Amino acid sequence: MMGVLGAVFAGGCAHYATVEHPPVVELRSIETVGILKFEVPEGDPEIGEDATHRFIATVQRAQPGTRVLELGTKREVLARIGARTLDPAALQAIGKMSGVDAVLSGSVEVKRPRTGVNIAGLTAVRTTVKVDASMKAALHETGKGAMLWTNGASGTWNLGGVTASERGVGGGMADPVRKHAEIMAELVRVTTEDFRPTFSRRRVD
């Protein structure tokens, strides 16, 4: 439901109200959401567990009361129901087996760092290290297996670099643990934007 949060007077006669708009996707209307551990096409499988927990925490902060049941990995769940792919029949079977009304699945990928070299004139050379990362997520209902929502995020992050010139060598690399947390937080923030309310200002005469 749309709600007026507050008002600010301006210009003598007119004033403006801050209006809250509901999320695009209201997860609290779903009895129980089952979540599959995020897949990791390439890299450390622990990244998937981290992404899954961050996703759940972000959604439940945005919509307190959302009921989530962790189901395990997609491979484990499909094996339990004797299916090969997450198709409508498999989603229906998951619903019956686990008692969930919707299934949220996703993937996260952090590529291998890549190095670039930039030559500034004849006196300086800068080497940079960057990494590409992406996240995808989808929500299906288990009644007929229809897709209710999907979204994703991707980006490139700078890990650091070194500059060499006639003045010497300088630079450094970012702390890997802090950079990983930064990347995961940003991917989750963008991917879950449809689960958060938005706000706008409206003139009230």
Regions found by a protein language model. Name each.
Residues 30-112, 138-142, 146-150, 181, ...:
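N-terminal segment of the mature soluble domain
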Residues 1-14:
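Sec-dependent bacterial lipoprotein signal peptides
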Residues 13-31, 97-98, 113, 127-205:
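C-terminal/domain-edge helix-coil "capping" segments
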Residues 86-88, 123, 173:
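Short alpha-helix boundary/capping motifs
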Residues 117-122, 164-165:
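Outer-membrane beta-barrel translocator domains and adjoining extracellular loop/strand segments
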Residues 39-43, 121, 171-179:
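Short coil/turn segments at secondary-structure junctions
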Residues 91-93, 121-126:
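Short, P/G- and charge-enriched loop/turn segments at secondary-structure junctions
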